[in-house]
């Protein structure tokens, strides 16, 4: 699906910061559409998007290095408002006649700004003489301002922490307003797009839904669409949106690989058939998948087997339907953003969903990707707009290879059943304790280790179950969830008493980094 037109767009020029996506999230949260474009193609992006405002991101680069990233001159010649963040401030000053020097030491962490001058960006937020927490992360610093700029706020280590040329509507900060450690940062960004750029903030999921439905109809016409429905939020929302647009021209195929959570496939099929009247084929291919996976211990080999078999099964089922012209995919905006290397050219990274990778080319189909402009949290809002229940929308992430990567070592039917039961009990206890929504992801892992235990009067030699729970904002970093010991004792007791094959339960207290959330 081609991207829909947005008359009020903010262009974010990405210089390679690890938190550029957070800038986009803050702009979107204020009801304004934005796109991230790497600095190498920013001029093309500027002409394509015709933005109402521009934000320049941070970067690990130094403006003092030869060949360091720069904003295209067309941005400063356009008369549009510009907001520079950290490196964005430095390159703005360097390009407009100011001076940037290497700092004697990096400034990283919490700092406090003092407002030196009233500024339109502070309206309803900060007042003259007030003091506010921000988050710094920089080495270089501005030491002389370009003509027309003045200081509006300072910190003890950054005399040019917040500068402005109000006549040209240029604003620039040395700190990071996009991160949660700058409490008023989201409001500053909202003030920039609303009060400075004059954008209304009427970009909503309701409006997106209407435009997306129209775009799908225009793209698909009277042709057939098939969708690989995994039971996850992304593919489910994509399927409902396409179904709203083209109705029975859509057929969904759920390939059950036998690696889902307890009763998951049956529950997904029931929900979509009973409540949404979708044409849905449930293909039980568990024997085929588990037969090939049995005894395989290498995690990458497991993933490759699952991906290959999925394509084979999906192709077979699509062939029985007589084929289709379009393949629906739940691609999200982070999947299609170009990753930026500030030392060389852009390297485009498009994550292929393990389920559908390679299918469009193999089956000679065009892609329909109605979610490719959205972040995950926006997909959840759209899902609610389409009528999906919160109990479904708010489910924890689940990996495409399913329980195969939560069963380290060789897989067997017996192990999968043991794991499935333990996982169901663990999640049940989390829900009973009212903790489910406070946790980003929770699951059980069946370890390829057996230990001696005593149950009744007998000796046991059974598997160890590890419990995992993490808190996170986006899955990029995570901390283990701090349960109280009473909860862990209760969950462990239930698992040992109710699941034959487990006689010991441990809790994983590893954060990410250094560990990953999943064990494989």
Swiss-Prot record:
Q: Name one GO molecular function term.
A: GMP synthase activity
**Keywords on record:** ATP-binding, Glutamine amidotransferase, GMP biosynthesis, Ligase, Nucleotide-binding, Purine biosynthesis
Q: Does the keyword Amino-acid biosynthesis apply?
A: no
The EC number of this protein is: 6.3.5.2
SUPFAM superfamilies from the UniProt entry: Adenine nucleotide alpha hydrolases-like, Class I glutamine amidotransferase-like, GMP synthetase C-terminal dimerisation domain
Catalytic activity annotation: XMP + L-glutamine + ATP + H2O = GMP + L-glutamate + AMP + diphosphate + 2 H(+)
The pathway it acts in is: Purine metabolism; GMP biosynthesis; GMP from XMP (L-Gln route): step 1/1
Q: Where is the Glutamine amidotransferase type-1 domain?
A: 9-202
| Broad class of enzyme this protein falls into | ligase
> How is the quaternary structure described?
Homodimer.
Q: What does this protein do?
A: Catalyzes the synthesis of GMP from XMP.
| Name this polypeptide is given | GMP synthase [glutamine-hydrolyzing]
The lineage, from the top, is: Bacteria, Pseudomonadati, Pseudomonadota, Alphaproteobacteria, Hyphomicrobiales
């Amino acid at each position: 699906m081609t991207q829909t037109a947005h008359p009020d767009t903010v262009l974010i020029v990405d210089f390679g910061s690890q938190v550029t996506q957070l800038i986009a999230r803050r702009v979107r949260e204020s009801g304004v559409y934005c796109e991230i474009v790497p600095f190498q193609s920013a001029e093309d992006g500027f002409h394509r998007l015709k933005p109402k405002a521009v934000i320049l991101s941070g970067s690990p680069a130094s403006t003092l290095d030869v060949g360091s990233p720069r904003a295209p001159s067309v941005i400063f010649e356009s008369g549009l408002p510009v907001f520079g963040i950290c490196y964005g401030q430095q390159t703005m000053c360097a390009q407009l006649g100011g001076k940037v020097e290497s700092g004697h030491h990096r400034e990283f962490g919490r700092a406090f700004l003092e407002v030196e001058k009233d500024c339109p960006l502070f309206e309803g937020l900060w007042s003259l003489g007030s003091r506010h927490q921000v988050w710094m992360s920089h080495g270089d610093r501005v030491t002389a301002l370009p003509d027309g700029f003045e200081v509006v706020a300072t910190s003890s280590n950054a005399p040019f922490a917040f500068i402005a040329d109000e006549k040209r509507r240029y604003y620039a900060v040395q700190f990071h307003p996009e991160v949660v450690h700058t409490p008023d940062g989201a409001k500053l960004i909202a003030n920039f797009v609303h009060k400075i750029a004059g954008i209304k903030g009427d970009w909503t999921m309701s409006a997106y839904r209407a435009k997306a439905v129209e775009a799908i109809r225009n793209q698909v016409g009277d042709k057939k669409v098939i969708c690989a429905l995994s039971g996850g939020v992304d593919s489910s929302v994509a399927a409902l949106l396409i179904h709203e647009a083209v109705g029975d021209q859509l057929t969904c195929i759920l390939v059950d690989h036998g690696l889902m959570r307890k009763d998951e496939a049956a529950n997904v099929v029931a929900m979509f058939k009973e409540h949404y009247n979708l044409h849905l084929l449930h293909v039980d291919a568990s024997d085929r998948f588990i037969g090939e996976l049995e005894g395989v211990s290498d995690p990458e080999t497991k993933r490759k087997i699952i991906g290959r078999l999925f394509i084979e099964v999906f192709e077979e089922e699509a062939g029985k339907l007589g084929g289709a012209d379009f393949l629906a995919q739940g691609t999200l905006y982070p999947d299609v953003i170009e990753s930026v290397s500030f030392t060389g050219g852009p390297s485009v990274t498009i994550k292929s969903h393990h389920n559908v990778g390679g299918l469009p080319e193999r089956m000679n189909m065009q892609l329909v990707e109605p979610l490719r402009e959205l972040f995950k949290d926006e997909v959840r809002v759209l899902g609610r707009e389409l009528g999906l229940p919160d109990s479904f929308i708010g489910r924890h992430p689940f990996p495409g290879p399913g329980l195969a990567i939560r069963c380290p070592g060789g897989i067997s039917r017996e192990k999968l059943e043991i794991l499935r039961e333990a996982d169901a009990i663990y999640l049940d206890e989390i829900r009973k304790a009212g903790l489910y929504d406070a946790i980003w992801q929770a699951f059980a892992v069946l370890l390829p280790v057996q230990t001696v235990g005593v149950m009744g009067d007998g000796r046991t030699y059974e598997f160890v179950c590890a419990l995992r729970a993490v808190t996170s904002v986006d899955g990029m970093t995570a901390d283990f969830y701090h349960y109280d010991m009473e909860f862990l004792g209760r969950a462990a007791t239930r698992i040992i008493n109710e699941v034959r094959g487990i006689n010991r339960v441990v809790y994983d207290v590893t954060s990410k980094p250094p560990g990953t959330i999943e064990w494989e």
